Amino acid sequence: MLVRRIIVRLPSSPRVWTQYNPRIFYSTGPNTNSTLVDTWKQKLGAYWEKSQNKANETANKLREYSVNFKTQWDKAQKSLKDANERLSQMENDSNDSKLNYNAEGKIKDLPSERERHRKKWARKMELYLDSLQETIFTATRALNDVTGYSSIQKLRNTISSLEEELKDTKKLVNEAKEKYETAIKARSGSQKEVNELLQRKNSWSPTDLDRFTQLYRDDALNSQTEEQSKVKLAELEAKEEELSTNLYRAILTRYHEEQIWSDKIRRTSTWGTFILMGVNILFFVIFQLLLEPWKRRRLVGSFEDKVKMALDDHQKEQNLAISEMSNTIDNLMDKKLQETQTKPHQEEVPKILTFSNIVADFKIWCSLQWTIYYNKLVTLLPETTVTFTKSCFYSYSTLLLSLGILLGHCI
């Protein structure tokens, strides 16, 4: 493959040799990557410097706020301590006998008496508020500084000063107008008198000549005074116009800044409301998914424990009653045996069967037969456990007790 080589010799230094290829272009000039890297380094360095400056400013502000907060916290603690001391001093004064002279209660509604009738927490709250007034004012001012309302307050003070200055300038303008009008009237009067004297120039007397000379001098002074009054009036009117313009601009700026501040506060309150709603929803989810099941399990467990304890107590009571019944039966049987052992010489009297005895024995036989059938039926059932109701348990216990007593009497 044939490749054409063209050597281009540039007049400027340094010399660059390029190789031309119809398909590929190779350049042996300076590398542009280093230039791009340097450019990006400069841009990033500028951004990094700006961000570092902002971070330093933020850190300084936070440090200043922390120092102010610590100072105000110390002041608040000192104020509360002073309030407690004053409260204790007031209580000591109220208990002092030297300060409680009341002429046998004839003097009513003394300040100390009213103060004693007030509640302690009300007096403490009043003293705390009085002591923390400076701290509250400082906290309010710090809040205004953070939200930017302090600048708006300064702007409002500037507007008030501009209004006062404009009011004073208007007074000066009115005075300058009066002086200017007075100067115009004085000059026009002197010119009118000069014209009258000039009309009868041929018949002047020495007095008229002196008067003309004086009027001529006064005319020059009046002209100068009029010119000065005019210049001063123009300056005051220009100042009034400037103050009016500045006042108008300041009022517009104030309304604009207050609108921005109110929008910022409204936006902050909206975000605060959303955050509170999110926190409430989070707490609701936590309570419903975590705490409520745990609480339910705990309640069920405690209820089961209480039921088990109640059943155990009932079982203990039943066992105690059965043991007492068995002890009573054993004691009766022991007494019966002792009686039979102590009286062996007595002859046994044959028992006479009566109809009532036969009926009682038949009932006992029926109950025993029913018990045997029931136990046999229970053994035939697939379940091995037997469940008694309270009434069935009581009837079964009564049957056993009566059977034991009957056997004891028979023996």
Swiss-Prot record:
**Short name of one Pfam family for this protein?**
She9_MDM33
Summary of subunit composition and partner proteins = Homooligomer.
- State where it is primarily located: mitochondrion
Instruction: Could you list this entry's UniProt keywords, alphabetically sorted.
Output: Coiled coil, Membrane, Mitochondrion, Mitochondrion inner membrane, Transit peptide, Transmembrane, Transmembrane helix
Task: Supply the name of the protein.
Answer: Sensitive to high expression protein 9 homolog, mitochondrial
Q: Name the source's superkingdom.
A: Eukaryota
Residue ranges of coiled coil: 69-103, 148-250
Organism in which the protein naturally occurs: Kluyveromyces lactis (strain ATCC 8585 / CBS 2359 / DSM 70799 / NBRC 1267 / NRRL Y-1140 / WM37)
> In the UniProt record, which is one GO cellular component term?
mitochondrial inner membrane
Residues spanning the membrane: 271-291
Q: How does it sit in the membrane?
A: Single-pass membrane protein
